[in-house]
Amino acid sequence: MDVKAEVIEIIDELFMEDVSDMMDEDLFDAGVLDSMGTVELIVELESRFDIRVPVSEFGRDDWNTANKIVEGVTELRNA
């Protein structure tokens, strides 16, 4: 499974929201993510992709859409 598909699956599993048709929509404004959800998402991303997401890199504006999450995970996997 590619990173995009897996990120979509993780968001769906955690928040019961299919974001495949809203990849560029702000997930905070859409009510998908909040502060607690962000923590859950980071933990799951780290577990599934064997990465470490530094808190300093998980800014709301930097990881607020599914596409930005995919991009961030891809960068961390390639680091």
Curated annotation (Swiss-Prot):
The modification O-(pantetheine 4'-phosphoryl)serine is found at S35. Belongs to the DltC family. The keyword Cytoplasm applies. 4'-phosphopantetheine is transferred from CoA to a specific serine of apo-DCP. HAMAP family: DltC. Keywords: Cell wall biogenesis/degradation, Cytoplasm, Phosphopantetheine, Phosphoprotein. GO terms for molecular function: D-alanyl carrier activity. Carrier protein involved in the D-alanylation of lipoteichoic acid (LTA). The loading of thioester-linked D-alanine onto DltC is catalyzed by D-alanine--D-alanyl carrier protein ligase DltA. The DltC-carried D-alanyl group is further transferred to cell membrane phosphatidylglycerol (PG) by forming an ester bond, probably catalyzed by DltD. D-alanylation of LTA plays an important role in modulating the properties of the cell wall in Gram-positive bacteria, influencing the net charge of the cell wall. The keyword Protein biosynthesis does not apply. Coiled coil: none annotated. The gene is dltC. GO terms for biological process: cell wall organization; lipoteichoic acid biosynthetic process. It comes from Streptococcus thermophilus (strain ATCC BAA-250 / LMG 18311). Pfam families: PP-binding (PF00550). GO terms for cellular component: cytoplasm. InterPro entries: ACP-like_sf (IPR036736), DltC (IPR003230), PP-bd_ACP (IPR009081). Pathway: Cell wall biogenesis; lipoteichoic acid biosynthesis. It is found in: Cytoplasm. This is D-alanyl carrier protein. Residues 1-77 form the Carrier domain.
